[in-house]
């Protein structure tokens, strides 16, 4: 197995100083799978202070648990001392850790066999728990007793599902049965951590595997709104964008269901509100003319409209023909290329201009601006001061808010 040069440099520095050191965990797994590891983590028998003595630039990122971050050029690498975890009284974190000189003790505390492989500087691999075999069999299997692993940390339940979705692996039988038994323990996991795993699932290449949430009996423990989820392989055809994919997943429910679930899970507002907005957008009929398309662009904005088209093309939001979507996309491009006015702020006449015409501030003023915009959406050629003044005066007369003809007239009466 090939080890990147900087990682090799760290490993060799440590071994030359008399310590053991290995790349470990997800980076080794991903390298075996031909995937580019996001991070390279290193495990060692050296104590944190000994690690710090070997490198010029370090950060104490988790010194209590034996982790030091080494900075090399523009990269950072976490180096953690071999350890044995104590009891997990909160079902999430070890109450204590004890450092150990034995690599095997460190590896057997980990979650799944595919995450237990360690690689030396020369590329040789230590695989004590059958990680390579499980990679070859495309399966997720707990290290040792799965009941113990899930009792220690309930987040591992969702990590198993997430790895299954990301790697398109099956979950080994004993691991799956234990996972289901321990689903109630998810009450010990913060909503933010749960959502982080769900986001990784829905952004994966196999979001349809979210149906395992139901199969494993997990939904009652994390959010009843997920009963309305649509786990579909069609979601994978969409760009890996959270609000877009959550909109697809909740497309058979409604926007408020999506918003409620995501807000309850402490999602960022952009994702929660964006998903709800997209769902409302794909519920309506596809516009058939320029006015309807301008109105759609005015309400949702061009980015959201293009995402709605993507959702519709992928089959979400109800039946619609490819020809309808092609025409909608074509009209959208024409409107945007022409620079048509699509918002009140782009009208040739502003609210301040209306007040100077003698129209009183208040809800009526906003209504008049809305009327002006609607007329311009129907006919962009009306977006001139002269035309809009006439439209505003007609609208004001209809509302009993009649302006004077001269700019600045303050004597307008109802």
What kind of feature is each model-predicted range?
Residues 1-414:
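Catalytic cores of the polymerase beta-like nucleotidyltransferase superfamily
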């Amino acid at each position: 197995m090939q080890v990147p040069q900087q990682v090799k440099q760290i490993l060799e520095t440590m071994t030359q100083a008399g310590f053991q050191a290995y790349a470990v965990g997800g980076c080794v797994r991903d390298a075996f799978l031909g995937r580019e590891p996001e991070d390279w983590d290193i495990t060692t028998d050296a104590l944190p202070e000994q690690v710090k003595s070997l490198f010029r630039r370090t950060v104490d990122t988790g010194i209590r648990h034996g982790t030091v971050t080494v900075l090399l050029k523009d990269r950072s690498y976490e180096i953690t001392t071999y350890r044995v975890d104590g009891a997990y009284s909160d079902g999430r974190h070890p109450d204590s850790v004890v450092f150990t000189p034995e690599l095997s003790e460190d590896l057997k505390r980990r979650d799944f066999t595919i995450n237990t492989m360690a690689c030396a500087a020369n590329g040789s691999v230590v695989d004590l728990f059958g990680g390579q075999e499980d990679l070859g069999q495309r399966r997720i299997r707990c290290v040792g007793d799965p009941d113990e692993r899930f009792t220690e940390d309930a987040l591992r339940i969702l990590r198993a599902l997430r790895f299954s979705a990301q790697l398109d692996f099956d979950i080994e039988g004993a691991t799956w049965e234990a996972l289901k038994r321990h689903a109630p323990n998810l009450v010990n996991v913060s909503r933010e951590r749960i959502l982080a795993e769900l986001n990784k699932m829905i952004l994966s290449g196999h979001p349809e595997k979210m149906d395992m949430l139901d199969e494993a009996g997990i939904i009652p423990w994390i959010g009843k709104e997920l009963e309305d989820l649509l786990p579909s392989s069609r979601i994978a055809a969409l760009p890996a964008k959270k609000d877009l994919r959550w909109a697809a997943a909740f497309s058979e429910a409604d926007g408020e269901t999506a918003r409620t679930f995501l807000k309850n899970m402490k999602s960022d507002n952009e994702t929660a509100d964006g998903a709800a907005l997209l769902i409302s957008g794909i519920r309506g009929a596809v516009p058939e003319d320029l006015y309807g398309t301008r109105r759609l662009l005015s309400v949702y904005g061009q980015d959201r409209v293009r995402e709605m088209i993507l959702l519709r093309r992928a089959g979400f939001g109800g039946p619609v023909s490819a020809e309808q979507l092609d025409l909608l996309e074509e009209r959208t491009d024409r409107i945007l290329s022409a620079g048509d006015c699509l918002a009140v702020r782009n009208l040739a006449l502003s609210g301040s201009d209306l007040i100077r015409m003698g129209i009183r501030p208040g809800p009526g003023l906003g209504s008049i601006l809305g009327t002006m915009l609607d007329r311009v959406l129907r006919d962009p050629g009306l977006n001139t001061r002269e035309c809009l003044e006439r439209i505003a005066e007609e609208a004001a007369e209809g509302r009993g808010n009649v302006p004077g003809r001269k700019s600045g007239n303050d004597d307008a009466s109802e």
